[in-house]
């Protein structure tokens, strides 16, 4: 079984996912998800997201990004814990 590089709490249609600043960067791998999702940054500094065939972009508190199902993407580690709100479509 593969451990996830985050902790997660789920309720209703949302997940709150927390990535620790102590996460090993090698755990933040390129991956795809089976469902489209809307991701909102609740807190975190210095983190970036990179979508397939795009340069990394900064992730700021309050940012919202749509990630289509089966699209490769990854996170790039920042300076603080990262907390995301995720709503799957």
Residue ranges and their predicted role:
Residues 39, 49-52:
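Acidic, low-complexity, intrinsically disordered interaction modules
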């Amino acid at each position: 079984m593969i451990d996830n590089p985050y902790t997660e709490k789920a309720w209703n249609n949302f997940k709150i996912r927390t990535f620790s600043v102590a996460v090993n960067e090698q755990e933040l791998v390129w991956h795809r998800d089976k469902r489209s999702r809307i991701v909102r940054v609740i807190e975190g500094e210095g983190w970036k997201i990179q979508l397939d065939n795009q340069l990394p972009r900064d992730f700021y508190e309050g940012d919202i990004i749509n990630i289509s199902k089966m699209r490769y993407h990854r996170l790039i580690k920042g300076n603080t814990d990262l907390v995301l709100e995720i709503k799957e479509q």
